Amino acid sequence: MATPMHRLIARRKAEANKQHVRCQKCLEFGHWTYECKGKRKYLHRPSRTAELKKALKEKENRLLLQSIGETNIEKKIKKKKRSKSVTSSSTSSSDSSASESSSESETSASSSSEDSDSDESLSSSSSSSSSSACSSSSSSSSSSSSSDSDSSSSSSSSSSSSESSSDDEPQKKKKKKK
């Protein structure tokens, strides 16, 4: 029920708002799109997918930079820890580490020989355990000079032997549970 009065009021409001309206066809202010008589101007605008791809690339780059920074920090911390552990293990005295490694090799030889006797069928599961079992059985069956040579070879690399023997012991415990 638009009376002529309502139409007049609506036209006046539209005329007042035209000054702030941009035509979507020619991109000029002052008239509505349906009133436009000009041609459509070309305005280069990136597509929505291109904008989304740019945003994703920026996020990935930020994450990569953050992860690279974090890994560099972690590497520095690990290097510091390694250098501290190496210096502390080397300063602890090489004689005590050699005697500890020889006693560890003798105890591991006796335990691994028991394992090899009881579980010969499972010895093929890990080459390191089978080689240690073979060397331990040969050292236990042969004279003490061979075990002395084993301990001297293990004492030559004291830091690596102490780390490897500590790593081997939990594996042997797992085998006993099976």
UniProtKB/Swiss-Prot annotation:
Top-level taxon: Eukaryota
Lineage of producing organism: Eukaryota, Metazoa, Chordata, Craniata, Vertebrata
Key words, A-Z: Metal-binding, Zinc, Zinc-finger
GO molecular function ontology, one term from the record: zinc ion binding
One Pfam family per UniProt: zf-CCHC_3
Spans annotated as Disordered: 66-178
UniProt biased composition (Low complexity): 85-113, 121-164
Record keyword Transport present: no
Alphabetized SUPFAM superfamilies for the sequence: Retrovirus zinc finger-like domains
Protein name, entry field: Zinc finger CCHC domain-containing protein 10
InterPro entries named in the record: ZCCHC10, Znf_CCHC_sf
Zinc finger (CCHC-type): 21-38
